[in-house]
Amino acid sequence: MTDRSKLSHFRRVFGRGDLGQCSNGQKGSVVIESLANSPAILALVVTPSTVIGSYFVFSLVLAVGLVTIFLRGDWQKARGLDKLILFGPLFYAAPLAGFGTEHFTLTVAIASIVPKWIPWHLFWAYFVGACFIAAGFSLVTKIQVRLSASLLALTFFLFVVLMDVPVWAHNPRDRFGLTFVLRELSFSGGPLALAASLTKPGRERAKNVFATIARYFVAIPVLFYSFEQFLHADHVPGVPLEPLTPAYIYGHAIWSYLAAVVYAVGGVLLLVGKKTRAAAAWVGLSVLLVELFVYVPIAVVERASLDNGFNYLGDTLMFCGTVLLLAGAMPREE
């Protein structure tokens, strides 16, 4: 059914007086009609099931993560920026699980982007989607988290090598193509940093090597995004992609310039290996502010759209999570 026909169907089913009969049939009809015309109900009815599914799984992982943080006492023990760093796994995991849901609701579309030379496209679409959802719950519950983080780092690195770089190579002048490449690279760096921080004692060399690789995987995208946001402040900030910042966003271009400045300072510190924990935390905070003041309003306005609503909200929150995952893996004192 189309959105309009779904709404008509809803009113036909729930707008009958006999469903709302109390002591007065007409009064029941008025109550039901008012309910059917309420903004919340109308928004739910006209929102496609694909969008609802992604938001549901996203919210479920978010809720589990929040409960875990507070029940384990992590929030009470953390101080200063460490309180923000606590949310790194949560901010990464919730969008990841939401994107995993799309592999089940948009299977054919997801399968179509798998390289032609790889067999069983539908299988990989389902398999990766299931893994993303499972990994999301793993990150927030800390069950087999090192395994999940390691596999996520490998998965996103393979995405970069097998899909993103070949696409960008067809048109190297496409700055958005490079933006996608570096975004996926950072999505590999975050969980790689987490896995490195969980390396068993006695393997300090391996831990330092992987943590350094993860730092570069995040620092390079942060610096490139800083440059892009200075040049194209009229485009959406955080992860600077093609859409222009909507006119209804309060402050408009100021969010791009704010993020660009913080990214520039934080990115340089991450690249040279100085004050890395604080640098990553401050970059993460700037992304979170962009998420709250830019992408949450966009998601509300575009609540019926995956492409223009949930996906941009999720991408930016996941980027925030990946930077905070890096922060959590960096030394406390330098």
Regions found by a protein language model. Give the residues of each.
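Short, Lys/Arg-enriched N-terminal segments with co-localized hydrophobic residues
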Residues: 22-30
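Membrane-interface interhelical connector segments
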Residues: 105-117, 230-252
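Short hydrophobic transmembrane-like helices used for membrane targeting/insertion
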Residues: 1, 13, 30-32
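Residue-level detector of alpha-helix boundary/anchor positions
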Residues: 12-18, 175, 307
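Extended, low-polarity transmembrane helix blocks
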Residues: 31-105, 124-131, 141-234, 250-265, ...
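Short hydrophobic targeting helices and cationic amphipathic motifs
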Residues: 4, 10-11, 19, 23
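Conformational-control "hinges and anchors"
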Residues: 136, 267
